Amino acid sequence: MKNPDKGYRRLNDDLRHDHDIHVNDKRILRICRARNIQSTIKYSNQGCTRQAKNPQYIAENLLNRKFGADKPNEKWLTDVTEFKWYEGVEVHKIYLSAILDLYDRRIVAYVIGDRNDNPLVYKTFDKAVKANPGAQPLFHSDRGFQYTNRVFHHKLEKAGMTQSMSRVAHCIDNGPMEGFWGILKRERYYGKRFTDKKELVDMIKSYIRYYNTRRVQRNLGVLTPMEKHEQYLAA
């Protein structure tokens, strides 16, 4: 099977998107069972970032789980997640900071670094602003230390953006962002043991490119994030 991470629903979405073949999910499920085709995805519980110890700025939860958007750059979500790679018995970590657009679910910008620190988040934000000049979305995050410091809040104000934050220990308040981490890790990371940092970094970069341009989503009308984005721009 070329893409062992795909279950029957995603296989059906690909048939519709790539080949204009329209059948119901149950038929695809029957075929998969008859041919012993099943997804190799492994599931794992996700952690939840809690409030920084000494937050300098706390914003209200203005997003309030309203995960819909009428246009690109109306609402952005952000977060940082970690990945491990191994060198003998030594465990190393790298960190991925990303910003997701709620309209088309595209990854607007991302940065990979060796440290989970303020510069990682600042660089991600700066990349997003540079790629989307004039954008003034509602900017939502958890209450991690990177997002609750005055410097970051000032960067948002300077860009004309309004800040929103999840409540403490309420991962669902940043649900679509957490969901993206889950998708990435289930499809390309869990069940694997990376022993080379470059291989892990290349995997992340390749997956984000695949996610934005090739991975169709049913909630986007069986389109990829970039197809949804370009469809709006062409309207």
Q: Would you name each region that the model predicts?
A:
Residues 11, 28, 32, 63, ...:
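Mobile genetic element proteins and their domesticated derivatives, centered on retroelements
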Residues 104-110, 163-166, 190-191:
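Short small-residue beta-strand/loop micro-motif enriched in glycine and branched aliphatics
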Residues 157-161, 183-235:
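C-terminal domain-tail junction helix/linker
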Residues 4-8, 24, 55, 59, ...:
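Hydrophobic (often cysteine-bearing) scaffold residues that line and stabilize catalytic clefts
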Residues 1-71, 170, 224-233:
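Basic, flexible linker segments flanking DNA-binding modules
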